[in-house]
């Protein structure tokens, strides 16, 4: 009976982490593709040039892959050392998420103001060489979200040092439309649009966050259950 419970928990944990590992592989592949094909894709912040969409996805994918690998190997080998490492890894990730969340809510105003200022400074890189990723990111954001600049279209006047905006700020996009009358531009800033979108989708984002939390807690519960089952059965892990 005990052995049957052990096998059940073992294979549940293995399948759980196999899906986890495959998801990490997928994210890592997407991150590498973005890095190779788009360069510094979506590197909107000049203060943190390494924080790009590609690098964030690669880092996230690598962490998920390593965590999933520890869980898979620990489960299939019934190795207490690996299972404990898996549990500790998930616990550290969970604590880091909670700390970041608390800091974000405590310093929301400071984070928001610094983000606005940093993004405005990043607009100056729009027309520079080797920043195709940044240009593509801003062009996509302004076209899809019907916005212009960080706080408004005048941000571009300061950044580009002349009274023009990128053509993707125009309500009807055509060559050099950014040099025409301002009544043809989207007037709302993109930062405001993003804040509005986050507010409109806060319930969806909260649900996703809860799902991630449940997955982490399940992984920790499965690993500790299997660890205890192995410990009680007296099985020694291999060095």
Swiss-Prot record:
InterPro entries: Tetraspanin/Peripherin, Tetraspanin_animals, Tetraspanin_CS, Tetraspanin_EC2_sf. It is a multi-pass membrane protein. Glycans are attached at residues 110, 180. PROSITE patterns: TM4_1. CDD domains: NET-5_like_LEL (cd03165). One of its GO terms (cellular component) is plasma membrane. Residues 34-55, 107-203 are extracellular. It is found in: Membrane. Keywords: Glycoprotein, Membrane, Transmembrane, Transmembrane helix. The chain crosses the membrane at residues 13-33, 56-76, 86-106, 204-224. It comes from the Eukaryota. Residues 1-12, 77-85, 225-239 are cytoplasmic. Pfam families: Tetraspanin. Belongs to the tetraspanin (TM4SF) family. This is Tetraspanin-9. It comes from Salmo salar (Atlantic salmon). The lineage of its organism: Eukaryota, Metazoa, Chordata, Craniata, Vertebrata. The gene is tspan9.
């Amino acid at each position: 009976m005990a052995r049957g419970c052990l096998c059940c928990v073992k294979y549940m944990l293995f399948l759980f982490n196999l899906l986890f590992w495959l998801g990490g592989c997928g994210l890592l592949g997407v991150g590498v593709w973005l890095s190779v094909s788009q360069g510094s894709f979506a590197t909107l912040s000049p203060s943190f040039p390494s924080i790009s969409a590609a690098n964030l996805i690669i880092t996230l994918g690598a962490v998920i892959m390593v965590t999933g690998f520890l869980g898979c190997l620990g489960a299939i080998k019934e190795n207490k050392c690996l299972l404990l490492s898996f549990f500790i890894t998930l616990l550290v990730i969970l604590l880091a998420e909670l700390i970041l969340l608390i800091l974000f809510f405590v310093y929301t105003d400071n984070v928001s103001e610094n983000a606005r200022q940093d993004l405005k400074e990043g607009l100056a890189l729009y027309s520079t060489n080797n920043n195709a990723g940044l240009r593509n990111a801003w062009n996509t954001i302004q076209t899809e979200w019907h916005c212009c600049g960080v706080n408004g279209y005048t941000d571009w006047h300061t950044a580009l040092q002349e009274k023009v905006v990128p053509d993707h700020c125009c309500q009807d996009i055509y060559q050099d439309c950014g040099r025409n009358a301002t009544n043809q531009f989207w007037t709302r800033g993109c930062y405001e649009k993003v804040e509005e979108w986050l507010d409109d989708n806060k319930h969806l984002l909260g649900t996703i966050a809860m799902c991630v939390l449940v997955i982490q807690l399940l992984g920790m519960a499965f690993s500790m259950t299997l660890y205890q089952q192995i410990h009680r059965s007296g099985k020694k892990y291999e060095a």
